[in-house]
Amino acid sequence: YFLKNTDRLCMNCFAPLTAGSVCPGCGFDNDQENDTSFLPLRTVLQDRYVLGHVQAWESDAAVYAAYDRTLQAPCVVREFLPKGIANRLEGNREVHVRERFRKNFDGYKRSFTTLWQTMMQLRTLAAALPVYDVFPANETVYAVSQPVDGVPLREFLLRTPEGYIPWEQARIMFMPVLTTLEALHDRGVIHGSITPDNLLLCPDGKVRLKGFCIAQCNTVQSDLEFNLNEGYTAIEQYDNDRKMCPATDIYAFSACIYRALVGSNPPDAPSRETNDKLMIPNKIAESIPTHVIRALGAGLQIYPENRAQSAARLRELLNAAPSVVAQAAQAAQPPQPEPKPQPAPQPDVRHSAPPKEKPKGGKNKAVIIILVVLIVAAVAAGIYVVKFSGLVDGRENTTQAAS
């Protein structure tokens, strides 16, 4: 159970210890033991993973710094150890569950297994945690992932001079995360706790999503510790009569974009039920594209049935800039609306004169026609008389005589 040849490795960062118990790199004192609720330092799981210092105890799991002897590299091990219903008795490796929580514990453990097996299947996605092993042991379940270094989005924003960033910069950060969210939702996984603290800006340029836990940690009606994040927790997570859905993550994700663009957290969801105003200072609003503001409005609707319902829909709204819409229109014809009754054909005004107003009465028209006929007849008669009365010929003879 214990690996002797790791005695000279730091149990926090796994760098070699040069002298003494304090790591010169991370400052961890290796004489410090884990609390008795957790497994001791240098415990080995699966004859492969050496457990180090406990980094955190989250709602559903203890998170250990660890070392993978097969890969000869640090890793992170999550042990399903839900707060309030399970612990570990001193000297025992097996997890101890309070009897009245046994049934719930078994259900939560299945949820934990499903969550991390799904994460392992999706580990190649840009924003996903690189999980590579899930296994049962010690009456519980463990999930192993590669360590992910990065700066939380909240910390990054606080380092900027204004406390917020322009949309063009935010777009590069956020849009790949939507692809990962969409894949998770397609597999039935709801994150339920997306915040600026759980979005990591990594050295490789990717933004990764951390803070995953089973869904039961993200609703008030659960036996487990509720992960409340004011401004980011959706109204359905406060309400026993509503269930989480993909729109729950859309709300939190939109709130993160709002924080990045505006520089402050949105109001918490319960307060918005009585005062639903998301104020953006004019100076900032002028720099945010109109279609992005509309997309945030769709993502931050209080009630889930009124929100953008999927990551794909939110992506469409965020991409709805006029130039993007024009490009999309060239690539594919949009759905055509149902045909409507067409009005009677109109004359082509480009090639014909406008129709003239009709006479008021048919009698006037007949009179005019008769007059025209009479005039034409009179003229014809006059020509006949003149031509055959000798006047023309006499005029010609006179001309000839004068010559």
Task: List each model region and its residues.
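Activation segment signature within eukaryotic-like protein kinase domains
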Residues: M173-F174
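Activation-segment/catalytic-loop signature of the eukaryotic protein kinase fold
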Residues: D133-V134
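C-terminal lobe helix-coil module of Hanks-type protein kinase domains
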Residues: E230-A326
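Protein kinase glycine-rich loop
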Residues: G52-E58, V63
